[in-house]
Structure formats: structure tokens, C-alpha cells
Amino acid sequence: MKHQQNPVRGRLNAWLFRILDSYMDGKYGVLKRRLFAELPDTVVEIGAGSGANCRYLRRGTRLVAIEPNVHMHPHLRAAAARHQLALELRPLGADPLPLADASAEVVICTLVLCTVFDPVAVLREVRRVLRPGGRFICIEHVAARAGLVAWVQRLLHRPWHWFFEGCHTDRATERLLGEAGFRQVTCEAITVPTAFVPIRTHIAAVCTR
């Protein structure tokens, strides 16, 4: 995951996302529980962060967590232990993914493709590591088509991009998923009523290799 890593912002974001954990669960929890309801025993997560998704995985799940921000790692380890997951932490990025070809049944990520340096390359890596029939499940904030949110996204893009280590408020992720070569892509448009206006427009996607 090639993003603009900065030790100060990395530490600050690790602290912030830990503080916002309950808030994010309130905003995304129902959706995540639905999408992650029937995951296999081993799950690969890109951008596992501070472990916000650990609560949605079954106890005993083997979680292969890709997370380059070392300041997130203590929170991630604590969350995995709290929810009784077998954590395998890979402190690397997603391009390339540190996994063998056709080795994963499921890859998940939430609010990550907005931040990666080259989402096309990351999606290519996801397809590479998925087995035939394997699924990529993601929730991402995306560019609004028009209106107030689109205007706010354009207005705040530069400071948001700087503070959140490369996050794009207006990335056309749905289009990128459709062009990534998956056999099937199912996208659901969602509006999340969050106080963070630039990221209210979302998609939830299931992509099958």
C-alpha cells in the first residue's frame, strides 16, 4: 500500500481511528455484519488498521492482516486478541501483496482503496491472490455524482488527502472495480449519515474472481 507514510500523521491517525472505533461501528456495523456474515476460516484483510473489523469475524478466524502503519499494530494485536482471532500480521503494503498466487478464498478491505497510491495495481494484486471463485469484499467511500457532497469533496480534497495520508475524497472506485477483470461485480450504493461530509457517499461491493 504505497501511500505517503509520515511518522507524525501515522501516529495521529492510529490514535484517531482507535478513538473513533465505537463511532465507526455505529455507522458501519450493520452493513459490515451483513457483508461479513459467512466468511471462511481464513480471511485476508488489506489495510487492517487498528482492528476495527475484528469484531465482525468469527472466533478462531485466521486473519492475515496487511497493514504498513506500524503505529496501528498494537491496537490491531489487541483487537485480534480480544475477539479471539489468530492474527498473522504482515507489516507491508498491498502492491505487491505478500501472498502466493491463488492462495486466498476471501480478501476484504474497508475504507482503504481511497488511500492506496495505485488502486488499479492493488486490484490486480487482489485478483492474483484470489482463488478462482474467490471473493473480494469491500466498503469504500467514493466520489459523489453531484450536489453538496461533491462540492465539499472538491473543496476539502487537498487538506483531507494530506491529513489522512493520501486519502482521496473523490475516487471513482466503482468504475475501477468494474474494470479490474473480476468475473462478477455487485455494487450497492450507500449513503452513510456521518459527520464527515466528504465521505458520506459509499459503495459496498462483492467481486468474484
Label for each model-derived stretch:
Residues 1-15, 29:
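N-terminal, positively charged/glycine-rich alpha-helical extensions of SAM-dependent methyltransferases
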Residues 4, 17-25, 139-199:
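C-terminal alpha-helical "lid/dimerization" subdomain adjacent to the S-adenosyl-L-methionine
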Residues 19-42, 52-56:
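Conserved alpha-helix/loop element of class I SAM-dependent methyltransferases that forms part
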Residues 44, 49-96:
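Class I SAM-dependent methyltransferase SAM/SAH-binding core
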Residues 95-107:
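A short acidic, Gly/Pro-enriched loop at the edge of an enzyme's catalytic core
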Residues 105-118:
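A short SAM/SAH-binding and catalytic strip from SAM-dependent methyltransferases
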Residues 120-132:
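A short glycine-rich, Lys/Arg-flanked "PGG" loop and its adjoining helix->strand segment in the class I
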Residues 202-209:
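C-terminal lobe and adjacent flexible extensions of AdoMet/dcAdoMet transferase-like proteins
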